[in-house]
């Protein structure tokens, strides 16, 4: 059974968050945590918190099952665009530039590693 965690209205550009989502997609949870800990990107903290939340949700959904981080895999990670705040920045000669403050919604889905039977 898979578990999911969603972080909404994160004040980061979706483009920047998708860079990190691509790094951890399909990886075991322990390996994904190591990647995020060593990342210099500012959004790595938000991805790490959401990943930990998804693992905790998996443990809560399966209370009789003891699983470690090596047994769980990041099945899906996707980033959707959130609300965009539009602001004005004063510009030369009485004009104004539009500043778009973007946000995103991060979804992380974890599942147990499927054992291949040969």
Swiss-Prot record:
Give the matching InterPro entries.
Answer: Ribosomal_uL22, Ribosomal_uL22_bac/chlpt-type, Ribosomal_uL22_bac/org-type, Ribosomal_uL22_sf
User: Would you kindly state one Gene Ontology biological process term found in this protein's UniProt entry?
Assistant: translation
Of the GO CC terms on this record, one is: cytosolic large ribosomal subunit
Q: Which residues form the signal peptide?
A: none
State whether keyword rRNA-binding applies: yes
- State the CDD domains in the record: Ribosomal_L22 (cd00336)
Annotated Gene3D superfamilies: Ribosomal protein L22/L17
Q: Which domain of life is it from?
A: Bacteria
Q: SUPFAM superfamilies attached here?
A: Ribosomal protein L22
User: Which Gene Ontology molecular function entries are recorded, alphabetically?
Assistant: rRNA binding; structural constituent of ribosome
Q: Which Pfam family, an example, fits this chain? A: Ribosomal_L22
Q: Has keyword rRNA-binding?
A: yes
What are the UniProt keywords, alphabetically? Ribonucleoprotein, Ribosomal protein, RNA-binding, rRNA-binding
Q: Which residues form a coiled coil?
A: none
The UniProt subunit note reads as follows:
Part of the 50S ribosomal subunit.
Q: Show the PANTHER family listed in the entry.
A: CHLOROPLAST 50S RIBOSOMAL PROTEIN L22-RELATED, LARGE RIBOSOMAL SUBUNIT PROTEIN UL22M
Recorded family membership:
Belongs to the universal ribosomal protein uL22 family.
Q: What is the recorded function of this protein according to its Swiss-Prot or TrEMBL entry?
A: This protein binds specifically to 23S rRNA; its binding is stimulated by other ribosomal proteins, e.g. L4, L17, and L20. It is important during the early stages of 50S assembly. It makes multiple contacts with different domains of the 23S rRNA in the assembled 50S subunit and ribosome.
Q: Which NCBIfam families match?
A: rplV_bact
Protein's name according to its UniProt entry = Large ribosomal subunit protein uL22
Source organism (scientific name): Chlorobium limicola (strain DSM 245 / NBRC 103803 / 6330)
Q: What is the lineage of its organism?
A: Bacteria, Pseudomonadati, Chlorobiota, Chlorobiia, Chlorobiales
């Amino acid at each position: 059974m898979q578990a999911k965690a969603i972080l909404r209205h994160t004040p980061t550009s979706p483009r920047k968050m998708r860079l990190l989502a691509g790094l951890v997609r399909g990886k075991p949870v322990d390996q994904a945590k190591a990647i995020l800990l060593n990342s210099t990107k500012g959004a790595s903290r938000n991805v790490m918190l959401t990943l930990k939340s998804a693992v905790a949700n998996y443990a809560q959904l399966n209370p009789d099952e003891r699983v470690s981080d090596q047994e769980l895999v990041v099945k899906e990670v996707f980033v959707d665009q959130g609300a965009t705040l539009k602001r004005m920045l004063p510009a030369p000669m009485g004009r104004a530039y539009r500043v778009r403050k973007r946000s995103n919604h991060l979804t992380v889905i974890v599942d147990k590693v499927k054992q291949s039977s040969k």
